Amino acid sequence: MALLQIAEPGQSAAPHQHKLAVGIDLGTTNSLVAAVRSGSSEVLRDEQDRLLIPSIVHLTEDQAIVGYEAGQLASQDPQNTIISVKRLIGRSCTDVQQRYPNLPYQFNATENGLPLLKTRRGLLSPVEISAEILKKLTALAEQRLGGELTGAVITVPAYFDDAQRQSTKDAAKLAGLKVLRLLNEPTAAAIAYGLDSGQEGVIAVYDLGGGTFDVSILRLSKGVFEVLATGGDTALGGDDFDHLLAEWIVKKSTVAPQNDREKRQLIEVANQVKVALTTNDKIRISYAEQNLEIMRDEFNFLISGLVKRSLLACRRTLKDANLTPSDILEVVMVGGSTRIPYVREQVGEFFQCTPLTSIDPDKVVALGAAIQADILVGNKPDSEMLLLDVIPLSLGIETMGGLVEKIIPRNTTIPVARAQEFTTFKDGQTAMSVHVLQGEREMVTDCRSLARFTLRGIPAMVAGAARIRVTYQVDADGLLSVTAVEKSTGVQASTQVKPSYGLTDDEIANMLKSSMEHAKEDIQTRLLTEQRVDATRVIESVYSALQQDEDLLDDNELSAVKNALVSLQKLIQEEDSLAIKQGIKMLDQATQEFASRRMDKSIRRALSGQHIEHIK
């Protein structure tokens, strides 16, 4: 007699069946896919036993070729072979063309200013091209694992903003891949480097890949990874080393490439030289029928400025965490560019310790993402892992006078929700505009606008009576939702912030720098603006009161109040916050008796016609 398989309603008959989940390192230069098999994380190889899949997409009329085969077609057909698409994702067309003027691609802009690449297959967005890479990785994983994927953890640079993160999720959706979570690349590397070992202390993750640089400072404590601070540069990586070498080759040979195909061939030669110099002190180069020679010391000199740039970002990030290099227990090296001996040497000197390089720097991010994916699908229910990422830039709201009130400060652990109450500025105000901002400065004009929406249906009340609760919520992927609720009626409005394009490289670098450079000036400006807003509010309140109850004052009292009003109105035009503050105080003193009489009048009106027994 056959045994029956019995399960609770809605429960799988095999509840402990291993679910297939992967970690994907969607890189600028190369991409990898990894999975946990037999209890350990491993990178999945393709049919030719290769680990790295070049992030290159070649487009024909009817198909997309991804990886090595696409790379072989790059020099023959550069306009239809898209390389380093990660640099383009989440950016505006203008930003792309200004930042990368030498790209061999032609662009059209959408109505929202997003770039579309002109290809043989038609106009395609960076999201659609990224989706082709994800399709390739998904197919590879399902072939190697022997089944359909439940989902994937996809890694992104810690410095990716909301638009870039959302674009990555959109690419996965187009590829038919469920995103379990977006995970910061440095955090993924830290997981791979011993979360289960119980090690405690502060570590730095130095991630120098093909197109982006990230540094994260993490505290490890009893199975908890807390990101103390993040920094980096979205336009710094091994690709930039290649371009510097290419310029050196052109200068030495005096032969410049004449077309896109020759440019691509030159970059390929430069990349081969860079790789060879990681293990050799001297390399011979054959280019344009000339034989050149470059020493490793010359290469080190060429890239020294870029390496220094990365270390300056490290110093800024340490400062954000209130730490010094000597506080760092270990440094984890991530990204293929960290194989360069000069990079390892300079990082070691800066942090005063020998960097960790025991895990292949190309694999480490994918391996960590796979571990996280395995946990998220429930294959490791006893895991005590807890990841605490942070937001890279403060999120705030515009208040009267063009000021920014920060709701969630920079480097706050996510996921997070913060709420703050605001009120109306004018009598009878029935709507409120909510302006969502990103940045570290005190004034709206110096921060980045993320979204605007309007809360309508506020009951008409005197200024300051309504209570509007504004909630900012950032999920585990760093995406922001904002909700505004009027408390007495429950009327609400909300938005999910999906900016049409991301921050430019200059904006990312300058936002933090300018906040430090202008800190003193910004505080003075804020104090002055706050006093002006307070003064304006008081003046409007007094004029409103006079319209209703001017008869409560005699001529001398009325004259004194009006003189104080005129004086304060003049002070508002000046640049002296202390003088305005004193003017508010003088007006307050001039209206104290008036306020007392108005209060008495209100009480008499409220008690009129009531029997004393009814008054409690």
Curated annotation (Swiss-Prot):
Protein name per its UniProtKB record: Chaperone protein HscA homolog
Similarity remark: Belongs to the heat shock protein 70 family.
Keyword Nucleotide-binding: yes
Keywords: ATP-binding, Chaperone, Nucleotide-binding
Species assigned in the record: Histophilus somni (strain 2336)
Keyword ATP-binding (UniProt): yes
InterPro entries per UniProt: ATPase_NBD, Heat_shock_70_CS, HscA_NBD, HSP70_C_sf, HSP70_peptide-bd_sf, Hsp_70_fam, ISC_FeS_clus_asmbl_HscA
GO terms for biological process, alphabetical: iron-sulfur cluster assembly
Record HAMAP family: HscA (MF_00679)
GO molecular function: ATP binding; ATP hydrolysis activity; ATP-dependent protein folding chaperone; unfolded protein binding
Gene for this chain: hscA
Taxonomic lineage: Bacteria, Pseudomonadati, Pseudomonadota, Gammaproteobacteria, Pasteurellales
Function recorded in the entry: Chaperone involved in the maturation of iron-sulfur cluster-containing proteins. Has a low intrinsic ATPase activity which is markedly stimulated by HscB.
